[in-house]
Design a protein with these regions (language model features):
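N-terminal secretory signal peptides that target proteins for export/translocation
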Residues: 1-2
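Bacterial N-terminal signal peptides
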Residues: 5-15
Length: 163
């Protein structure tokens, strides 16, 4: 009888775990580019708009707690492009029950801006900028397994202006 109770309890816990995985919140990502005309030799601003389900947050890019997973936007850039700066939004405080210090989080909707430098000798044509968005979605009770979402920006680059 004890063995049966143990098996039922173990099965119930695994079912809860599987159920939580199927309900894992997903960030909706919208990549845009601020400039209409993009020329070699200039800077361009990439924008990633992130929308999370209601009552969901992600840790900031600079969490206060060393044990949480920060939100991170990274790139594998083609030759001729350089990331000059990534600007994350200001975080908000989120206090969990029984925690002394609030967590630094990004809530429901936020944007990340990236200043990208284009080499002056970059060939004209379409350029694809691939990125990865790492985040861990959490609600007020638990954090879900971290996810990495692929994102990309496509831009038509014109030749550099000659002086």
């Amino acid at each position: 009888m004890i063995r049966l109770c143990f098996l039922v309890a173990a099965f119930s816990l695994s079912a809860v775990s599987v159920s939580a995985q199927f309900r894992q919140p997903t960030a909706e990502l919208t990549p845009t580019i601020e400039q209409q005309v993009i020329r070699a030799g200039q800077n361009v601003t990439l924008v990633l708009s992130v929308e999370l389900p209601d009552d969901i947050h992600v840790q900031s890019d600079q969490p206060r707690d060393p044990y949480v997973i920060p939100t991170l936007l990274s790139f594998t850039l083609p030759e001729g492009l350089t990331v000059e700066e990534i600007t994350y939004p200001e975080s908000t405080d989120f206090l969990l029950e029984d925690w002394d210090e609030p967590l630094a989080v990004f809530d429901h909707e936020f944007t990340i801006e990236v200043r990208l430098a284009l080499d002056s000798d970059l060939a004209p044509g379409e350029v694809v900028v691939p990125g990865s968005f790492l985040y861990q979605a959490c609600d007020d009770r638990l954090c879900f397994p971290p996810k990495t979402a692929a994102v990309e920006w496509r831009m038509d680059v014109e030749a550099a202006l000659t002086p």
